[in-house]
Amino acid sequence: KRDVGDDLTNGEPSFVGHRIQKMVFFRNRIALLSEENIILSRVNDFYNFWVKTAMAISNADPIDLQSSSTYPTRLFDAVENAGGLVIFSASEQFLLSSGAEALLTPETAKITYAASYAFNSDSNPVSLGTTIGFLNNTAREARFYEISEVSTRNEPTVVEQSKIVAELFPQNLTNVTASTENQLLLFAVDSTLHTAT
């Protein structure tokens, strides 16, 4: 609930009236993905998306950013890595970070373009330790990609890890999970989803 200000000085978070695609935890904030926006709560006040004072910007204030691209960028999922929060749309990946600054604040937070790989929005990207894996189902068979070194300074490295077994992957893969301790990846099809076969 808004305690201070009005619609001009303390406007509603951009998720109001829109579907929330995903909720993740990032740097002591709850992050909501809604349409092409990412909205982060106040620091350590996980369900508060309002500023505390309309007079000045605080480092703990909520963050509300929009991704921008030449393609539609509805955001579906996100995974944290060393460089920040890697965010997935159906056709691109973005990085939410504080740039060279140590603290993630409303003034330092920014979303930058990272890569342009198709992502199966019915699936979830998975952390593989220091890298991130994700499914792509735009070809005849599904593909599994691994993205690493995502930062604001360099282009990430993206490798198709499923190339060696490409013809064994059905096109409608939707579930992937990883066990870094056992060096194991498991893939499955969720038969409750309406996906192409």
State what each model feature region is.
Residues 1-5, 11, 33-60, 96-104:
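Beta-propeller domains
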Residues 5, 13, 28-29, 83, ...:
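Homeobox/homeodomain signature
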Residues 11-36, 72-79:
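Beta-strand-rich domains and repeat architectures in extracellular enzymes and scaffolds
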